[in-house]
Curated annotation (Swiss-Prot):
Protein name per UniProt: Large ribosomal subunit protein bL21
GO terms of molecular function: rRNA binding; structural constituent of ribosome
Record's signal peptide: none
The species this protein was found in: Rhizobium etli (strain ATCC 51251 / DSM 11541 / JCM 21823 / NBRC 15573 / CFN 42)
Protein family: Belongs to the bacterial ribosomal protein bL21 family.
Amino acid sequence: MFAVIKTGGKQYRVAANDVLTIEKLEASAGDSIEFTEVLVIGEGADAAIGAPFVAGASVKAEVVDQTRGKKVIAFKKRRRQNSKRSRGHRQHHTVVRITDIVAAK
């Protein structure tokens, strides 16, 4: 069974025991979280498609870790002006493991 969930402005296709990196959630390692914005749930031709979400469906997950992404460098240089600026950014991420997919009753 699989599901498509929406979190952090992105959509993810998940199945049981999947480990995925998503945008930061306010939770610590070991906490249980539940995603209620389920767009599609099912298996094969028996998939239920929501409009926009499947009523009563949810995906349960466990927070594995809070991490940070790779550094992205923003570099600006103004030619012939002896002027430049370098700035770095690291995005915060949450690593979760999908524990259960609950279909609508």
